[in-house]
Amino acid sequence: MQIVQKTNGRSMKRVLLSSALLLVSTLTFAQSKVSGTVKDANGDPLIGVSVMEVGTNNGAVTDINGNYTLNVKPGAKLKLSYIGFTPQTVKAGSNSQIVLQEDNTALNEVVVVGYGTMRRKDVTSSITTVKAEDLNQGVFTDPGQMLQGKVPGLVVSSTADPNGSPTITLRGASTLRTGAMSPYYVVDGIPGVDISIVSPEDIESIDVLRDATATAIYGSKAANGVIIITTKKGSKERTNVTYNGYVAIDNILKKYDVCTADDLRQYAKDNNITLKDGGANTDWQDEVLRTGISHNHNVNISGGNGSTNYMVSADLRKREGVIKMTGFDRFNVRSLVSTKTLKDHLTISIGANMMYGKHFGVPSGNEGASVLDAMNYYSPTNAVKNADGTWTVGSGSKNYNPLALMEENKSETVWKRNQFVGKTALELWKGLVWNVNYSWSNYQSTYSAYNTRNSQLEGIGNKNGQATRNTYFGREQTFETYLNYNFTAGKNKFDLMAGYSWEEKKNNDGFGLSVEGYYNDDLGWYNMSYAQTILGVQNSVQSGYLEKVRNISFYGRVNYSFDSRYMLQATIRRDGSSVFGKNNRWGTFPSVSAAWNITEEKFMQNQHIFDNLKLRAGYGISGNTMGFDVYSSYNTYGASGTFVYDGKTYRTYGATKNANPDLKWESTGMLNIGLDFAFLKGRLNGTVEVYHKKTKDLIWSYPVSTTQYIYGWMDANVGEMTNKGIEFTLNAVPVRAKNFMWSTTLNLSHNKNTVDKMQNETFHTTNLTQGDPMVAGVSADGWTQRIMEGEPIGTFYTYQYAGTVNGRSEYYVLDENGNRTGETTNNPSLKDRSITGCAQPKLNAGWNNTLTYKNWSLNAFITGVFGNDIYNSPRAHYTAAQMFSDGKNVLKEFLSNPVGDASSSLPSDRYIEKGSYVRLQTLSLSYTFRNCFNDWIQDLTLYGTANNLFTITSYKGLDPEVNMGGIDPGIDYRWSRYPHTRTFMVGVKINFGGSKKK
């Protein structure tokens, strides 16, 4: 028995040993070695092709000869991927010679144009498309901020003010009217939409139409360029729920280096000066500033079936400003349902959008009544409050305690906006589609402000509380119908479009009221009936004047392509508007452009350098009606003052505008020439563009004789302006390895602006002075810029600083030709001014880099501005001798200035500084978990983003990114410029895949 058991034990060991050897042998032979060569259609080897075993992380990369070797399991499949080529999946070992075909996705991608779409390959105009994943990341409230640095020629001056909007200029200023330089926005085919109704998280892509051949189809609204926003749509395959949320903190980038209380005391002691000393040592910047906390939550639900799809999104965002008591809350809802019927010949879409926002602000007026100003000038020797709990008060006038400004003068603005959209597209027969779009929207804004009985504002503190509320309404309607017809005849391809548009806007319907005399401050602006007095007739009741504007348009476009080699496009739009004079209600805006796909020619078929080479050229005319109301060309009358009769105050009325029946829109003609190129199988591609933009009939208000006209000024079309420049874009994939890729994009732009004409035989003005920063010690002629014929907007025209002589700032004396006489003076005259700088940059740059390794992604985005000047008015103001003598704080730089230098702050090149800078605008790191959870979560992405990490600049102010819009660019205004911030945010994006439709 025991022998049997022993024998069985030995047998078992042999069996186990044999099994182990068999298993090892099996595993060894299960990994078979496969090899092959990857080439392109021309037989050239492809280097760096990713060869991956499907369903595993096992892979290899082709060598310099296109060869690869890989150990794979039996029956495995290989996926081959290479930039610029269509991915291909093959059975391992089935073919040692693999040919990858070029991927024409980039050329065949759809580009959104006015009233339609086109293949990128067929585009003859200048259009830049930015996908959602390529937009700037950060705590943004405006889609314009997401484009900063992404589009050549598009200059975006951002702001950290949670209640502010960026200024946007495309290819230079085209008007002299402030507020009329912004591009025209189109959202999902609906023109003129207020983009506050669009949540940044809902954006699918943004197309920027940059030249007149692309924008002319929008006629009189398109001189400043057109930005087309496409939002996300529903899905037909499955119900998708996506959540995207983040939390962020903001801190100020830099503080002014103002004096401490001890600095002021030491300065007064050293110079035997009496100091108005409150006995404290307060850091007012610390008292006013805070770390702003923001959060955003966006939920997007989409789904559908074969004929119907839907999308609903809700977006809740809250942002605190770095100035205490500033911020906003906003809630957006967006919905869209689309369905196809009549055997898919009819598509009907219905959408509804809503926005509710509440903005909180603090005083930001000039003349010292601004928290942004007071936190720098209010003396650090003053305490926050007196011993009895009341606010400390600065000596003299316009010397406000910044915390008192905030706490005792509160305001908020509530915005409500609704939009309803209906769209139909009926295919009448193959290639012919009839589109009908209708949009209706309304808005309401309500402003509320309350000044308590403790307010330090002049004329307010003795009112026992003053409340102001006003509310205004507006409604807009847009109806458009157009036909698209495309067909092919042999090698000839046609795409025709013709349409009609009708718009109506009713704005400014509202009123306001101010009251005073409350029993206490508990109610604020609520229950205004409790106040004792309605303010006097001069400023008590505010009333809007209802205006109705109508625009009617007819438009058309022809696109022709022969054999994908030669393309021609012609557009025309005829616009009529009620805002202009009766003699010029209608205008025509044509354009024509052509393109030559050189690489499609037979003589290019055997070359191996260019993958794409296309030459484009075009000329078009577009207009500018922004900033006009229904009364722009009419005589108008309004309240012009008051008079007292029999002890009562009455209004007086007088003329406020002259009629001009010849007033018409400004028109901009633009010539654009572009070259598109691609090398190395698409790994290197880009565009070079040159343009010449001429704007005529610039509108300005000119002085006229009151013996001939009822009012002393008249709006007229007189001026001319030119912008010309060059733009360059380069996209590249320098590294593409097994699990790693580096992609980069560089864009550069240069624009030269010139004011060509400002007067004619009827209307005269030699120059226009602009940009008065209201600096202490400058009682008159504080302006710093002049608009002149032959010079660009933003030309600084100041005195030339000569240094300090005997404790006084001296300036060069100029002769009648503007040359220095060799003499200096501390009391210069206007003739001693000259051109001393220019705010226009010579170069704008944006450089984006994305590195991906497996599921990791790192993005770094750098922006730069070069060759511009900035007028540092805060430095001029906070170093003025008058500031110290008035008991206000100053910069530490002041301590080294001569005592009592009364002329130090005059507008001069002493305060004009180089504004060039390079900034790491965005650094973002993310990790995506894919298919790591159950069927209900497709992927989850964790990300962290930092904005404005560092800036390289020689500018001495807070930040070199000053406002570059308007007609006074490049001036650093102290009282209205919200400080820029450094932002850190962390977020998560979860895609709940849901279940597929059966």
Question: What feature does the model see in each segment?
Answer:
Residues T922-I952, I967:
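C-terminal structured "cap/appendage" subdomains that terminate the fold
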Residues S235-N281, V322-K324, N332-Q419, N435-I552, ...:
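Surface-exposed loop/interface segments of Gram-negative outer-membrane beta-barrel transport/assembly proteins
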Residues K842-G867, Y911-N931:
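C-terminal substrate/ligand-recognition segments
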Residues G245, A314-E320, L568-S577, A617-Y619, ...:
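Transmembrane beta-strand segments that form the barrel wall of outer-membrane beta-barrel proteins
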Residues I323-K324, S578-N583:
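Solvent-exposed loop/turn segments connecting transmembrane beta-strands
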Residues T231, T260, V299-G303, S335-T339, ...:
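Residues on the lipid-exposed face of transmembrane beta-strands in outer-membrane beta-barrel proteins
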Residues F328-K340, R585-A595, L940-F950:
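Short secondary-structure subsegments characteristic of cysteine-rich extracellular domains
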Residues M1-S335, K340-T341, L346-M355, T392, ...:
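Short, small/polar-rich motifs associated with maturation and membrane association
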